[in-house]
């Protein structure tokens, strides 16, 4: 009798789990992204593209998921996940303990860090300590804001909802520096900002991006399996090399 009950419970649990993914496969998922974060996600013509976009496309193909990309400001993504208005999000979201209290993350898929960007003729700022007393452009709601408030409390932070606006503020001389995620800073310095700005150093390293989900989402385990598969079969390396020009 006991064995029968245990078996029934296990069968029920298995059915519930497979049913959760079946629901995910049947419905069109809303996947949020901040499309002003080159080269991870941005709009090219009428198409959304970037490392995160390609990675999610590969994951969705692996799991046979239907989805719709929902562009939104970065600072609206976590509230959207908390209210379950969105099913998942990829936007260079740093995995942090405070965020883990309100949302869930996949396994890390990219190691990042922060870098300092200054005008090309600026030779006075070379590291984080030099930001003390300076006006620094940063993106609202990011780990950069928390880090600078903690480590360089005398820096005067100027907040922007869009990192492109922060870079423009620097390029036009209205701030002393901009600090943001290393790959995005380097991309801007080598493209739109070339000849006007330069990267003078990293602020910190060891940050990781994760795909974000509402708390308790059954998709986390399945997405982690898909990530592992993509890394094992070489697909992740192909996507990485496409956007960063090197192997991870």
Where does each model-flagged region fall?
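Sec/Tat signal peptide C-region and signal peptidase I cleavage site
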Residues: 18-26
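Extracytoplasmic small-molecule ligand-binding "clamshell" domains
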Residues: 26-92, 101, 233
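Alpha-to-beta junction loops
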Residues: 30, 64-66, 82-91, 134-135, ...
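Short helix-initiation/N-cap motifs at beta->coil->alpha
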Residues: 68-79, 123, 140-143, 158-168, ...
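A ligand-binding cleft/hinge motif common to bilobed small-molecule-binding domains
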Residues: 92-101, 147-150, 171, 176-205
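Periplasmic-binding protein-like
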Residues: 110-118, 182, 186-228, 246-248
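Flexible hinge/capping segments at coil-to-helix
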Residues: 119-136
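Ligand-binding clefts/hinges and TM-proximal coupling segments of bilobed small-molecule sensing domains
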Residues: 143-160, 197-200, 225-248
């Amino acid at each position: 009798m006991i064995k029968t009950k245990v078996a029934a419970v296990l069968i029920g649990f298995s059915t519930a789990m497979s049913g959760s993914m079946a629901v995910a496969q049947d419905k069109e998922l809303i996947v949020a992204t901040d499309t002003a974060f080159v080269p991870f996600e941005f709009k090219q013509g009428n198409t959304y593209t970037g490392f995160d976009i390609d990675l999610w496309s590969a994951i969705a193909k692996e799991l046979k998921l239907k989805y719709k990309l929902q562009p939104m400001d970065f600072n609206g993504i976590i509230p959207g996940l908390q209210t379950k208005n969105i099913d998942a999000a990829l936007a260079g979201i740093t995995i942090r303990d405070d965020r883990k209290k309100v949302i869930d993350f996949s396994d890390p898929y990219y190691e990042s860090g922060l870098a300092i960007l200054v005008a090309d003729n600026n030779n006075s700022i070379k590291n984080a300590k030099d930001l003390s007393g300076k006006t620094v452009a940063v993106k609202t709601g990011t780990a950069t804001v928390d880090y600078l408030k903690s480590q360089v409390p005398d820096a005067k932070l100027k907040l922007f909802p869009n990192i492109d606006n922060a870079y423009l503020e620097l390029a036009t001389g209205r701030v002393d520096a901009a600090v943001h995620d290393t790959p995005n800073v380097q991309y801007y310095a080598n493209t739109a900002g070339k000849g006007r700005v330069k990267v003078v150093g990293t602020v910190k390293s060891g940050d990781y991006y994760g795909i974000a989900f509402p708390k308790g989402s059954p998709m986390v385990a399945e997405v982690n399996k898909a990530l592992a598969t993509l890394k094992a079969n070489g697909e992740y390396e192909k996507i990485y090399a496409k956007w960063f020009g090197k192997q991870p």
